[in-house]
UniProtKB/Swiss-Prot annotation:
Functions as a voltage-gated monoatomic cation channel permeable to both potassium and calcium. Plays a role in the cellular response to DNA damage. This is Voltage-gated monoatomic cation channel TMEM109. The keyword Hydrolase does not apply. The gene is Tmem109. One of its GO terms (biological process) is intrinsic apoptotic signaling pathway in response to DNA damage by p53 class mediator. It catalyses: K(+)(in) = K(+)(out); Ca(2+)(in) = Ca(2+)(out). GO terms for cellular component: monoatomic ion channel complex; nuclear outer membrane; sarcoplasmic reticulum membrane. Residues 34-83, 157-185 are lumenal. Keywords: Endoplasmic reticulum, Ion channel, Ion transport, Membrane, Nucleus, Sarcoplasmic reticulum, Signal, Transmembrane, Transmembrane helix, Transport, Voltage-gated channel. Homooligomer. Interacts with CRYAB; in the cellular response to DNA damage. It comes from Rattus norvegicus (Rat).
């Protein structure tokens, strides 16, 4: 039963990870291209366009998606996303300009150079779009790194658990064979067992806590389902009595 439940969960996590990788590559490619257009000088654009790895990855990924979904479908999706992103970026740009104007007036009233200090808030829609794309890419990459680190830590936990057991068995055999005095042997074995128990408690507390939390959540969902069934079952006799 455990294997039957673990395989679909692992496949779902893998599918989500693949989708997030594709999304991250698309976002980073779009953000990189937008950055070159908005924040770089024309000479820098010419120098970096030929040696941009993200651009090559984005082109390859776009060709792959065109093959899978079709050029027309990808064109419709990209145009829709661009229109939505441009509308959001325009609204944020207008808000930034309004905020910069208010802040400039307040700073000027205080005797400061408000126009110069609020220049950073005057973002065009294209610049806002670039910042949003990089922010979305950063969030996706953060999620991927969290997932990868979770898998690595889980694997390291298994490896450390096996290594801990091997070291305990080796220490146990070494103590039994090398310590002739029964009293000293008993004390050393007690110390070894204490260390092993403490390590087991420290390393297993987090995993057991998350496992218990998952069980509690499952029980809460089952209780809610039972309550819903009881309510529906209680409504049926009332409706029959009214009829």
């Amino acid at each position: 039963m455990a294997g039957a439940h673990s395989n679909p969960s692992w496949s779902r996590h893998l599918f989500k990870a693949v989708l997030m990788v594709l999304g991250a590559l698309l976002l980073v490619h779009s953000a990189s291209a937008q950055t070159h257009r908005e924040f770089a000088s024309p000479g820098q654009q010419k120098r970096e366009s030929s040696a941009d790895i993200l651009t090559e990855i984005g082109r390859s990924l776009k060709e792959t998606l065109d093959t899978w979904l079709g050029p027309e479908t990808m064109h419709v999706i990209s145009e829709t996303l661009l229109q939505v992103m441009w509308a959001i970026s325009s609204a944020i740009s207008v808000a930034c300009f309004a905020l910069s104007g208010i802040a400039a007036q307040l700073l000027s009233a205080l005797g400061l150079d408000g126009e110069q200090l609020t220049q950073v808030l005057k973002l065009s829609p294209s610049q806002v779009q670039t910042l949003l794309l990089w922010g979305a890419a950063a969030l996706v990459i953060y999620w991927l790194l969290s997932l990868l680190l979770g898998l690595v830590l889980a694997l390291l936990g298994r490896i450390l658990g096996g290594l801990k057991l091997v070291l305990f068995v080796a220490g146990f055999v070494g103590l039994v064979r090398s310590v002739p005095d029964p009293s000293t042997r008993a004390l050393l074995l007690l110390a070894l067992l204490t260390v092993f128990a403490l390590l087991s408690r420290l390393t297993g507390s987090r995993s057991s806590g998350t496992h218990l939390e998952a069980k509690v959540r499952g029980l809460e969902r089952q209780i809610e389902e039972l309550r819903g069934r009881q309510r529906r079952a209680a409504k049926i006799p009332r409706s029959m009595e009214e009829e």
